[in-house]
Amino acid sequence: LWVSIENEEKDDDDDPDNWWYYFGSNGKAYKRSDSASNDVSLKTINGKKYTFDEEGKMQFGWVADGERQTDDDAWQNCDYYFGDENDGAMTVGWREIHIVDENYEGSQPNDDIWDEDQDRWFWFKSSGKKQTDSVNKNINGKKYGFDEYGRMIAEWYTETTYVDKDTT
C-alpha cells in the first residue's frame, strides 16, 4: 500500500511537497536496513524496483549511499537514478535527464549540448547502474559512446589509431 505524507520539513525547492512510503502486507513500512552496505537497497513492488531511506521515505532522482543527492553535480557522482518524486522506480534503459554542468566548455554558442543547463541521455543497465566510459557500447544493435559521467556522447566521434613509424 502506497501512502503519501506531507513533508512538514520542506525548506527548499529540492525537497518534495510529500514523501511516499510503502507498507507491506505486515503493515510495516519498507525501509533501508542499517546493515545495507551497497549503494542502494532495492525493494521490488509490482515488478518495479525502489529504494527507501532508514525512515521509510521513497528516494527519487539521483541516489548514492541510500540517500537522495540534490547537488548540481549529483549526476556526476551517482550511479543510480530513481525517477521523480511521484514515481521513484529505478531507471533501466534510456532516460533523458536535466543536468547542470558547471564545468562545461561553452565553445559553441546557442548549442544545448554546450550549455550549463542540459538535457542529456543516459543508459542504465539492467542492474540500474548507469553506463560510463564506453566508446563502442552496443545497445540493441547500435553503437553508442558515453563519457566518464555517463552522458551519451552526442557529437561526432572518430576513433584514432596510431602506427609506430619504426615498425614498418
Describe every region a protein language model picked out.
Residues L1-T168:
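Extracellular adhesion/carbohydrate-binding repeat motifs centered on closely spaced tryptophans
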